[in-house]
Design a protein with these regions (language model features):
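Membrane-proximal intracellular helices of multi-pass ion channels
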Residues: 1-568
């Protein structure tokens, strides 16, 4: 037990210590300053020349968003065509067939929004070709999209008064070549050394210790895993994701993969402070996020290491904690840490089954995604926090009777309306989706049965499974309570719609707020200016997030996770 706790502490310390220099480096990359990765410039110039893009051409916020949305539409069409026709494409040694239209729609939307909602099993649902040229490609470019959007916001906020927020294409390419690719190469090399396979052979026939024959899937796993972790996408080429011994073969590999989930989202908070030359503000944001993360880690580790009271009643020892749905080689504490790390970001990868975690652990996993602000996905997590900064600044200004300001720009009704829509959309689509699914389950049993019945665990846990699915979609997370039968017409299309709304409406709103603020006349700081880099304002922002985001979900948790906990 003590060793498991020490492993958790070591991983968190590594994340915190290494995120600071990475954040400093990322800020330099986006500011165009000299860095060790400048050797990539010739490669970038070739990419821009072939694409006909001038990376030095400035864009206003509307042009920036137009480029972002148009290229995402192209990626969606690209992915749909390849997923439906993958059965006749090369690199398919196992003969996997093409996906149905509704499954391809869900898969393509999921990975296009940097999510990994997988209503299929990676070994049989995709080929090596689509793993590389749809899934892995999307894991790079959609992560880079979020980072590019944040870079544009940072440029807008750093300027006193400006009409432009940088070049989307430049930020997109820099995010891939200077951040995601180098880190992926390092992590991939470590995983190969640890035993993760890398190749294009088909299933390997093996004889088990019992003498039975088994076929083990392989593939370019060591290439896919690093970016799925670093890009906070999480989509695995195996159905059980990082629970699989070929994906996550050792405890050290598990530490590296868990570290990879959070290192860039943590670094982005520091990058903001360095970019704007307001390090105290970066520290304040980082501190609030880290506090919320550590609270979740403590709760889940204690819940999972404490065991299941129902098993205690049977007189069965639980020296290793609640081990249902967990890997012996990793243990309950490492699984609990991962469950919080993957949900506090938009990663969604798992090294154990969330459906089998204790009810309060499941509640914490969902609350992380329902709040969707603590670190979050690469780039977009900080942007969600930015939304609540605007709301907190506005409320604070009203409380003291002054015009709200943030970084020298007035926060007025237009920005507040956009921030309110973004903040309220998230609970709205989660709760409406869950209510619709619950209504159909109760009042349209024939329809539900025609789709396979949906729930293996009706009751409190069944409601939790449906709530988790829509929560995961809205947060672009992708993990799930896998007792839900979700590869159906209803779940594929309804989840796809929630995925789109949960990704693009916030990005559009947040970039618009930054662009509008940037055009306003700069107001120099004075004695009456609200200081946003203090502990007091950090607490204020935390309170606003808790009241607006978290409290919206406690009624439904009372009917699901909390009720299940009290029934144990």
């Amino acid at each position: 037990m003590n060793t498991e706790v020490l492993g958790v502490i070591a991983q968190i310390v590594l994340m915190v210590v290494l995120s600071y220099p990475l954040g400093k480096y990322i800020a330099k990359v986006y500011k165009g300053e000299k860095t060790w990765s400048d050797f990539m410039k010739p490669v970038e110039r070739v990419m821009f020349k072939l694409s006909g893009i001038n990376p030095n051409e400035e864009m206003n916020w509307k042009q920036f968003l137009r480029a972002l949305l148009v290229v995402n539409l192209f990626w969606f069409l690209w992915g749909m065509v390849l997923l439906v026709t993958q059965g006749v494409l090369p690199l398919n040694p196992d003969g996997n067939v093409g996906q149905t239209a509704h499954q391809a729609f869900n898969t393509c939307i999921s990975f296009m929004v940097n999510c990994n909602l997988q209503h299929y099993s990676g070994e049989s649902g995709l080929t090596y070709f689509t793993q590389l040229f749809v899934i892995m490609l999307f894991q790079f470019i959609t992560a880079a999209t979020g980072m590019a959007a944040m870079a544009g916001i940072m440029k807008a906020l750093a300027a006193k008064t400006t009409q432009t927020i940088g070049n989307f294409w430049n930020y997109l390419v820099l995010s891939c070549t200077r951040v995601l690719l180098p880190l992926s190469l390092v992590v991939g090399f470590i995983l190969i050394v640890q035993g993760t396979p890398m190749g294009f052979d088909g299933k390997m026939k093996v004889t088990t210790m019992e003498g039975a024959t088994q076929y083990v899937s392989q593939g370019p796993t060591a290439a896919i895993v690093p970016i799925k972790q670093l890009g906070t996408n999480g989509g695995g080429d195996f159905g059980v994701n990082s629970s699989h011994p070929l994906v996550n073969p050792t405890y050290f590999a598990n530490m590296v993969e868990c570290w990879s989930i959070l290192i860039i989202p943590m670094a982005m908070a520091f990058a903001f402070g360095f970019y704007l030359k307001r390090k105290k503000l970066g520290y304040s944001i980082y501190g609030v996020m880290l506090f919320a993360y550590l609270v979740g880690v403590c709760i889940n580790v204690s819940q999972e290491m404490g065991g299941n009271p129902r098993i205690d009643e049977m007189g069965i020892a639980q020296d290793n904690g609640a081990m249902e749905g967990k890997e012996i080689r990793l243990g309950s504490a490492a699984t609990a840490l991962w469950s919080i790390t993957t949900t506090v970001t938009s990663n969604g990868s798992v090294n154990g089954m969330h459906d089998s975690t204790m009810p309060l652990s499941g509640m914490m996993e969902m609350l992380n995604m329902q709040i969707n602000t603590w670190f979050g996905g690469v780039g977009v997590g900080w942007m969600n926090y930015f939304t609540f900064i605007i709301i907190a600044v506005f409320i604070s200004g009203l409380m003291v009777g002054r015009t709200p300001e943030f970084l020298g720009h007035k926060v007025e009704a237009r920005e507040m309306k956009i921030a309110s829509i973004v903040a309220l959309l998230h609970p709205f689509i989660i709760l409406v989706g869950t209510a619709l699914a619950a209504y159909l389950f109760v009042h349209a049993p024939a329809f539900v049965e025609s789709e396979g019945g949906w729930l293996n665990n009706p009751g409190y846990h069944g409601l939790s499974e449906m709530l988790y699915e829509y929560t995961s979609c809205a947060a672009n997370n992708g993990s799930g309570f896998e007792g839900l039968g979700d590869n159906t017409w209803f779940w594929n299309y309804s989840c796809g719609i929630v995925l789109i709304l949960g990704r693009f409406v916030p990005i559009v709103g947040q970039v618009a707020i930054a662009g509008i603020l940037a055009k306003k006349k700069f107001i120099p700081e004075s004695a009456g200016t609200l200081q946003t880099d203090t502990v007091t304002f950090g607490v204020m922002t935390f309170a606003v997030i808790f009241i607006v985001a978290a409290l919206s979900f406690f009624p439904v948790h009372a009917l699901s996770t909390i009720a299940e906990h009290l029934s144990l």
